[in-house]
UniProtKB/Swiss-Prot annotation:
It comes from Drosophila melanogaster (Fruit fly). The gene is DppIII. The active site is at 507. This is Dipeptidyl peptidase 3. InterPro entries: Dipeptidyl-peptase3, Peptidase_M49. Belongs to the peptidase M49 family.
Length: 786
């Protein structure tokens, strides 16, 4: 998918954040194998973990200021309005009720992302929500200032709250690095203790004591999400490492279990280590076909239980059942029926069935999706974050995408691979432009291609959406670093138009293209094994996906970024076709030339000027899938030579200059990108993770020296970075007249916080989140010292 957050995650030595996620953002993977059982048995529950930092080892103020620079949100943090008022007002009352209840389900489900972020994230959310719910911001501001807090520090407190609410936790949805407040611990504590919530509710003080050190902790493990000892994750218990994930994933593959809906906790029972694979569900009891009793595999013990996120999923299902009453047709009703069963039982098959009804629901007035969808933030690349969205179809803007779909089967022929590497038949998807009412999770994308289930996408179909009111918030005013004045002018004029083209091509013909070569349980191949050649080597095909293997499980840690790179490359490559640009309304050759140039320039600029923010120089890890993908494409085009791309340091330690020779895009650029794209597709089709990893790691390398010392230049890029936009979303409510009302908010820090206060107008949700943390804390002893 194509995320606008600039476009929101590579962890560990396997650069994990790069797991397949079909969306476009705004802004060495080992194959699964059996590991010696001694690894598991030698790791007790509290075995030699790097603990969270605590108050005794926090840096001193001067050191802290420098250390936190990359982790704070500035007081100038921009907030923008996700405007959907006119689109919402055009709905019928029945449609508004459907949108309202589905939005409620999405918001409640989106809170699961807090639990999936860090052990402390739900408590930080609860602390801040209780504080702002108890009194108006101007009242709290007056009390804080009277207590000696500066106006700037109070603003920093508000900005931190915005960051936690917007990212569903205290780690960035785009990049997975920690967010810490841009004010001192002392001033933060002063504000908390000045609040009415602190005075009136004893539990607020208790919550604060639990999280105050965790809020500011910036030891190396706290800086990013990932496996111990290099990061924090809640998809796995504290004592799980990359090696544990390989043990668990090997067992899951042997059982044909996809891990989208689960977390894994390594516990000790009766002196034995057990991997408890826990499914998200309302039900907790055992059920044949879903849970599994304790069993041994390769010397390790496993079981599947359920009941994770129970109370939140109960709320989700209650709202979905209300939405079902206002469904427009059988497709929507059946879709919801299966979603409810999925969340009740912890059944991935039921969610797949719901997704099948969803793809049949062509051209709905209201588009929705909900569930455990995207796998960016799991260090192992398989467990999915919960999200849900509700949006209204913009028929006028959708027309161009419909034409793209109608011609897609022919347009795919422009891609550089041969027919055997393409799907047997093209399944025309729905492709619409939407105005988002609700997008709950750790960030808001600009475009989406779902479902992510391989067997449905390849054999049954999928949908693409472009989120128009998200695209409308692209910044076209501020200076653009590292470009000439002429290029800045062109970028500002054509960036949105070019981005819309890239979104469309990335989603429909990027994620929507290509075939996976498989052998099934009966030994039947889904491709002509005798006559299909490897386009890279010219030799017969010798690798393919085995029964039980999926792209996700095979490509694991690099999968997300690798797939985003493939889709981005498809977008660039096909944007050279003028008949495609005409579909988007660009018929004048001079305008087409500018669209092509700006599309290529923009992606290359993102790859060199923005992406490096998402590289961690300590761990040498990429922290974000799309950023790594763009850096890789930039390196491919830079290495193509012949003056196509040039990057030079114009002011030592201060500035860079990027130039792209537009006269060579259609020649040097086309060939270099076509050759690279062919390799990307061949390695994906043939499940050749070894060749894919070798190539991808080469282009992902951030050099310390040489003609392009990217590691050194990263500091220059960080000095020029701009904060990512936070989008304030409307709320819906049913009035006394039983009609749905839309409530919008000012695009300010105060307005954004108010939207969350009114979204949850009492502390019930805080009680619920706190109870989940209490239940789970035994799995995360390093956070809670238990």
């Amino acid at each position: 998918m194509f995320w606008l957050r600039g476009l929101q995650r590579s962890r560990q030595q396997l650069n994990r954040l790069c797991h397949f996620r079909s969306r476009l953002n705004y802004g060495t993977s080992p194959s699964i194998r059996s590991v010696q059982p001694s690894i598991s048995r030698s790791l007790g529950f509290c075995s030699s973990l790097v603990r969270y930092s605590c108050s005794t080892n926090l840096p001193q103020p001067a050191e802290m200021a420098s250390k936190t620079a990359h982790f704070v949100l500035p007081n100038t943090q921009p907030i923008a309005d996700l405007d959907c008022k006119s689109a919402f007002e055009n709905l019928t009352e029945k449609e508004k009720l459907y949108a309202h209840h589905f939005s409620q389900a999405s918001w409640d489900g989106g809170l699961i992302a807090l639990i999936q972020s860090s052990p402390e994230a739900p408590l930080i959310f609860s602390l801040l929500h209780r504080i702002f719910l108890a009194e108006k911001i101007p009242v709290l501001r007056a009390k804080a200032l009277e207590a000696g807090v500066s106006a700037d520090d109070f603003t920093a407190f508000l900005v931190y709250a915005c960051g936690v609410f917007a990212n569903a936790g205290n780690y960035k949805g785009m990049g997975d690095s920690k967010i810490v407040p841009n004010l001192s611990e002392k001033q933060f504590e002063t504000i908390v203790k000045a609040s009415a919530a602190y005075s009136d509710e004893p539990r607020v003080g208790k919550i604060f004591e639990k999280v105050k050190n965790l809020i500011y902790a910036l030891e190396s493990r706290n800086e990013i999400l990932g496996f111990a000892p290099d990061g924090i994750t809640t998809y796995w218990s504290d004592n799980c490492t990359k090696e544990d994930s390989e043990i668990v994933n090997a067992w899951l593959t042997s059982k044909r279990i996809e891990p989208y809906m689960c977390r894994t906790f390594k516990i000790v029972e009766n002196g034995q280590t057990v991997y408890d694979v826990k499914l998200g569900s309302v039900a907790e009891s055992t059920q044949d076909g879903i849970t599994l009793p304790l069993e041994e595999y390769n010397g390790n013990k496993f079981r599947v239980t359920r009941g994770d996120y129970q109370k939140l999923l109960q709320r989700v299902n209650q709202h979905l059942l209300q939405a079902q009453k206002y469904a427009a047709n059988e497709n929507e009703s059946k879709m919801i029926e299966h979603y409810v069963r999925s969340f009740e039982q912890g059944s991935l098959d039921e969610h797949k069935n719901g997704s099948r009804w969803w793809i049949k629901d062509k051209g709905p007035v209201i588009e929705t999706y909900i569930g455990f969808i995207e796998t960016y933030r799991d260090p192992a690349g398989g467990r999915a974050e919960f999200e849900g969205f509700v949006a209204m179809v913009n028929k006028e803007s959708s027309a161009k995408f419909s034409e793209l779909v109608n011609r897609a089967e022919k347009l795919i022929e422009y891609l550089p691979w041969t027919e055997p590497y393409e799907k047997d038949s093209y399944l025309k998807p729905d492709f619409t432009s939407l105005d988002v009412l609700t997008f709950a999770g750790s960030g808001v994308p600009a475009g989406i291609n779902i479902p992510n289930y391989d067997e449905i996408r390849q054999d049954e179909g999928f949908k693409n959406v472009s989120l128009g009111n998200v695209l409308a918030n692209i910044n076209r005013k501020d200076p653009i670093p590292f470009l000439t004045e002429e290029d800045q002018t062109l970028m500002k004029e054509y960036k949105v138009k070019a981005f819309e083209v890239q979104v469309g091509l990335h989603e429909l013909l990027g994620h929507g293209s290509g075939k996976l070569f498989r052998i099934d349980e009966n030994g039947v191949y889904n491709f002509d094994k005798e006559n299909t050649k490897n386009l890279v080597t010219g030799e017969p095909i010798t690798k393919w996906y085995l029964p039980g293997e999926t792209y996700d499980t095979k490509f694991g840690a690099i999968g997300s970024s690798y797939e985003e790179c493939r889709a981005e490359a498809v977008g660039l490559y096909l944007s050279l076709q003028r008949d495609i640009l005409e579909i988007f309304g660009f018929k004048d050759k001079a305008e087409q030339d500018n669209i092509i140039y700006v599309n290529w320039l923009s992606l290359i600029w993102n790859g060199m000027g923005v992406a490096l923010e998402m590289f961690n120089p300590k761990s040498k890890l990429w922290l974000q899938a799309h950023s790594r993908a763009r850096f890789v494409i930039m390196k491919v085009l830079l290495e193509a030579g012949e003056g196509l791309v040039k990057v030079e340091e114009t002011e030592k330690g201060k500035n860079l200059l990027l130039t792209v020779d537009r006269s060579k895009i259609d020649t040097v650029g086309r060939k270099a990108l076509g050759d690279f794209l062919t390799k990307l597709q061949v390695y994906k089709s043939t499940a050749d993770i070894e060749a894919a990893s070798k190539m991808y790691e080469h282009y992902s390398k951030v050099d310390e020296s040489g003609s392009h010392p990217w590691a050194k230049w990263r500091d220059i890029c960080l000095a020029h970075k701009k904060p990512r936009m936070i989008l304030v979303q409307a709320n819906t409510a049913i009035g006394q007249d039983q009609k749905v009302q839309l409530k919008t908010y000012e695009p300010t820090h105060e307005g954004y916080i108010q939207s969350w206060v009114e979204r949850y107008p009492n502390t019930d949700i805080d009680d619920l989140l706190e109870s989940i943390v209490e239940k789970d804390k035994k799995y995360f002893p390093t956070a809670f010292n238990n």
